[in-house]
Amino acid sequence: MEACCSDLEVDINGEQTIFLNKQIICAYSGTLRKLLGKSTSSSGNLKVIFNDFPGGAESFEFVSRFCYNDGRVAVMPSNVVFLHCAAKFMEVTKVLEQTEKCMEEIRYWAWPEVLLCLKQCQEVETSPEVDSLAAKLMDALVEKLCLTIEMSPSSAGSACSPDSSLFRFSCDSKSTESFKNCSVRLTWWFDEVLVLSSGLVEMFLKLMVLRKFDNLIISRFLFYYQKVKFCSASSHEKRKILETIIDTLCVLDRSCVPCKSLFAVLRLALGLNINKSCMNKLEVMIGHQLDQATLDNLLVPSPSKSSHLYYVNLVLRFTKAFLDGARSGLQLKKVSSLIDQYIAEVAPDPCLKPSKFLSLITLVPDSARESHEDIYRAIDMYLEAHTGTTDGEKLNLIRTLSYEKLSGESRAHISRNQKFQAIETLDEQQQQQQQQQQQKQLILRMEKVETSGENEKLKEHIEGIQWRVMELERACLKMQNQMEVIKKRSKSSSKGSNRSLPKLCS
């Protein structure tokens, strides 16, 4: 283009300066027409600076070529994102019409074309328009992936699982090779998706779950995603990645999420201070699979602010989450045994308070423990390491033991154990106090019974007196009536007689 015709200078995000003809570019761009106004016909060069142009200089050049080519441009998957965003910014309606028409065919694009467009979306500054375009592209990408997996000869993810019958019962080299090929067919897309930003990966995962994609494959991808991305991510990015992983794992089938992997995520999460909501979800997931955990899994170091050697509160929360769910007797016994091992491990911790130690002992129901041997040894170790424990605190710990669940050797050891002598004396005193209190209550109850009996007799006596009074009143009334009759008869028969009968009743 001739230099004399280039009367408009455009600075694109400080990356590049492009010289254009004002009349040509303004004929198509509504944005530049508004900016330049009447100056389009004036003499002299003008300069426009764009600091937030979507897609940068490359995107601007796409639109410029359209303007200089009499409104013609080849819109294709490789340039549609930049063209669409630039046309939206520059208000070039003719380009927008062509890009929107092109995007109507997204579902027919090849996988690499859709993935390329998504990569271009993350290069453009975020806006509602870009987000909407990315959502359409991501929906198409997930749809293609689902169709590809369904059409695969080994589409069922469980068939390639190490826990499946295919893997369990076929250990020869041929079947192992078959398993590897199956795994590759189902996970080929892992590295390709990892080129996307964490925000787009999160969108991808939500759509995968929504479409009920194989949970085992999603789980494998999540742990692979964490492993690869953590190598170069900042602390903030790591936190974001972990939160996305946890939010996705908690909606997957529990059987598809290995317990060991959850503990690996936990150790990372504790070091990154992820948000409380995600941490709670992770703790509940681990709690639901606590019967599959090992002692090493539970021996998590205490946070730096705490003086404890191990994170006891964390184990308390795990166990609570386990007990809140419906569990079989076998699972409960496994967890009970695991907690007893943990108690023995943390008992020597000099900073572990008696109340916290007692909480651990009483954490699982007593019915889950067939023996109290491990608990007794743990209590003995605890009292050995905590010489300042009061007799009352010791008594609370000893009372958790069921002597029926102790061996004869342990019972004999208790009777000889110097640490328990003061406890026995205190226990006897408390039993005496309880007996005295029970005797007082018995006396009070007896006194109440005696008082109640006397009151009953008095009541009967009063009722008898009232009955006799009523009988006398009726007899008196009857006699008065009879006297009235006698008086009337005596007046009529003996007229001259002044003698009256004595008054019997008034």
From Swiss-Prot:
Involved pathway(s): Protein modification; protein ubiquitination
Chain residue ranges for the region called Disordered: 485-506
Coiled-coil residue windows: 421-492
PROSITE patterns listed in its UniProt record: BTB, NPH3
InterPro entries: BTB/POZ_dom, NPH3/RPT2-like, NPH3_dom, SKP1/BTB/POZ_sf
A GO BP annotation: protein ubiquitination
Keyword entries, A-Z: Coiled coil, Ubl conjugation pathway
Domain NPH3, first and last residues per copy: 187-435
Gene3D superfamilies: Potassium Channel Kv1.1, Chain A
Domain of life: Eukaryota
Signal sequence range: none
Record-annotated BTB domain positions: 6-76
Pfam families given in the database record: NPH3 (PF03000)
Domain notes: The BTB/POZ domain mediates the interaction with some component of ubiquitin ligase complexes.
Family membership: Belongs to the NPH3 family.
Free-text function comment from the UniProt entry: May act as a substrate-specific adapter of an E3 ubiquitin-protein ligase complex (CUL3-RBX1-BTB) which mediates the ubiquitination and subsequent proteasomal degradation of target proteins.
Descriptive protein name: BTB/POZ domain-containing protein At3g22104
